[in-house]
Amino acid sequence: MATKKPENMSFEATIEELDNLVDQLENGDLALDDALKKFERGIALARASQAKLTEAEQRVSILLSDSDDAPLSDFSTLAE
């Protein structure tokens, strides 16, 4: 089964996979090479999740702007 790139996964799927990886790493039964691969995958998932959260915060901030007559601003994603 091919592993999806974290940036192409939903936030929920990313967190679920990250949670599973943490459980496997905490168990301590993995060979060093396997543990390192899972750790690298976990870092990629965590970074992608953080980017999605930052993007969501930016969108919420724009939507909840205090002033009704505030100028519209362009939304830019982190991927740009």
From Swiss-Prot:
It catalyses: Exonucleolytic cleavage in either 5'- to 3'- or 3'- to 5'-direction to yield nucleoside 5'-phosphates. GO terms for cellular component: cytosol; exodeoxyribonuclease VII complex. GO terms for biological process: DNA catabolic process. The keyword Acetylation does not apply. Its main location: cytoplasm. Belongs to the XseB family. It comes from the Bacteria. It is found in: Cytoplasm. This is Exodeoxyribonuclease 7 small subunit. It is an enzyme of class 3 (hydrolase). Signal peptide: none annotated. One of its GO terms (molecular function) is exodeoxyribonuclease VII activity. Its EC number is 3.1.11.6. InterPro entries: Exonuc_VII_S (IPR003761), Exonuc_VII_ssu_sf (IPR037004). The keyword Flavoprotein does not apply. Bidirectionally degrades single-stranded DNA into large acid-insoluble oligonucleotides, which are then degraded further into small acid-soluble oligonucleotides. Heterooligomer composed of large and small subunits. HAMAP family: Exonuc_7_S (MF_00337). Keywords: Cytoplasm, Exonuclease, Hydrolase, Nuclease.
